[in-house]
């Protein structure tokens, strides 16, 4: 990882336009590898702030970040497509100070003061992209695996947004499409032609972690771990079978990638 955010805000006077160009450069130079397992503290250090909410549009670093969870006790209903290339991310509720029962009121796009909430900021950016008025926002996606343990799912483009009724109220849905040039690919493989890794389903990740005991299957290390496809997706492998996913440390993950190339 390389911290290269210094001076970003001085070089991007407009809300859109130059910010996206500068942001892409920053993301290319500093990130985790796709599928890398990290601690909460590592994640916060990488993003330069203590992440306390799930939706974070344009942090001080210039990056946009979302935190997701598909655990049984997750507050929101996020979904991953069967091919692992699209995440449908649910917007966030009103705060307890704004509603007695947040799950019973529409997810807000504006605060009481009239400023945009995180829902509103993401929705506005998606509509700008949908109408071809700006490039898609690049979003870093982290998924909670266990308390204190996270996985970097990759860099995604915010392509669309809409509202739907969940039976009680209207909720926002944000469509994130896996970038064909994710920042994670650069660390795992220098080959620009290598197809982008797909997101591994959450239940598969948890089962693999349990089976492999939270350590590299080749050397037993417990740090710098990655979820690795035994047979790569580009060679016919799949992300949905536990049998095709294993835990590897960074060294063995990179060694395997170099052999494949």
Which positions does each model-derived feature cover?
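Acidic, glycine-rich low-complexity segments with interspersed aromatic residues
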Residues: 2-151
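Generic recognition of long tandem-repeat/solenoid scaffolds
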Residues: 65-69, 174-176, 216
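Short, charged surface segments at domain edges that flank catalytic/cofactor-binding sites
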Residues: 125-127, 181-215, 239, 243
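Eukaryote-biased feature marking scaffold/signaling PDZ-domain proteins and nuclear chromatin regulators
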Residues: 134-136, 153, 171, 222
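A structural signal for short, well-ordered beta-strand segments and their strand-loop junctions
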Residues: 141, 217-218
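Compact mixed alphabeta submodule
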Residues: 144-192
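Histidine-centered nuclease catalytic patch
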Residues: 219-247, 260
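Long, charge-rich boundary regions
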Residues: 250-261
């Amino acid at each position: 990882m390389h911290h290269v955010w210094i001076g970003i805000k001085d070089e991007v006077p407009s809300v859109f336009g130059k910010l996206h160009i500068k942001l892409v450069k920053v993301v290319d130079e500093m990130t985790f590898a796709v599928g890398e397992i990290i601690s909460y503290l590592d994640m916060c250090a990488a993003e330069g702030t203590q992440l306390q909410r799930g939706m974070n549009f344009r942090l001080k670093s210039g990056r946009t970040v979302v935190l997701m969870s598909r655990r049984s006790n997750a507050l929101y209903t996020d979904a991953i497509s069967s091919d692992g290339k699209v995440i449908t991310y649910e917007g966030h509720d009103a705060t307890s100070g704004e509603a007695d029962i947040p799950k019973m009121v529409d997810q807000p796009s504006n605060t009481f003061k009239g400023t945009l909430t995180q829902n509103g900021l993401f929705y506005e950016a998606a509509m700008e992209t949908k109408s071809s008025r700006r490039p898609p926002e690049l979003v870093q996606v982290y998924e909670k695996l266990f308390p204190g343990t996270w996985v970097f799912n990759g860099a995604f483009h915010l392509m669309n947004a809409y509202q739907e009724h969940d039976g009680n109220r209207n909720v926002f849905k944000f469509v994130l499409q896996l970038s064909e040039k994710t920042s994670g690919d650069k660390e795992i493989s220098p080959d620009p032609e290598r197809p982008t890794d797909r997101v591994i389903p959450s239940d598969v990740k948890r089962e693999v972690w349990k089976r492999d005991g939270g350590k590299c299957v080749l050397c037993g290390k417990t740090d710098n771990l990655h979820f690795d496809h035994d047979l790569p997706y580009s060679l016919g492998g799949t992300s949905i079978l536990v049998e095709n996913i294993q835990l590897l440390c960074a060294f063995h993950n990179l060694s395997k990638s170099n052999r494949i190339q």
